[in-house]
Amino acid sequence: MSHSDILFLSQSSGSQFQKVTTFIDIANNMIYEYFGTKTDFDIIICHGSWEMEVQIVSRIHNLHSGQYYTTKSAAITDYRLKEIIVRCDIAKFGHYLHELIHGILGKKHPHQLKEGLAWYFTEVLTAPKVYLMPSLSVFILESYVTPVRKLASILGEGFLKDFALGNAYVHEEAFSKDIRDLFLPEEVFYTKKRYFR
């Protein structure tokens, strides 16, 4: 099993510490039960927009080219450094689950595909308790989640899970345009999204 460290950037109250570590433990257990693995990414917990801004600015060159992060982001994942950064004052359980899923996804998937897979599986794992799923913007739903839902209906849940982990492969040419777009180079995908908005 994988192991990750949790680092709090600033002093937390006992209740805040307990909430964060409980969310991480429960999310990791859900992921392990469903996928049979869990992330080894370290988790950095920050509080407030200033701490999040420092994290974003310090790693902006590691983040994906088309992605736009703000201090309002609840969480981000830095694949190069294998770190998940969570802004605990605004993150809900679903944000922790979503980012921890990012940590187990196949390394060769482009960012937008990882984003879609992570939100899709967050939705699947929170289905019994839908209140745990954060509300998603129309952009996230249309760009990431809807195409992955279509992919799941074609491939089936088991195969999609293997594919998400990087243990199975697909020929994206066989799918509709919205699904194929998830396989584009990141720069092309995000340029198209900005241009056609």
Stretches found by the model and what they are:
Residues 1-15:
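N-terminal low-structure segments adjacent to metalloprotease catalytic domains
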Residues 12-90, 110:
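Auxiliary, metal-adjacent structural segments of Zn-dependent hydrolase domains
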Residues 94-107, 118-119:
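Active-site recognition of the HExxH zinc-binding catalytic motif
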Residues 107-146:
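Post-HExxH zinc-binding segment in Zn-dependent metallohydrolases
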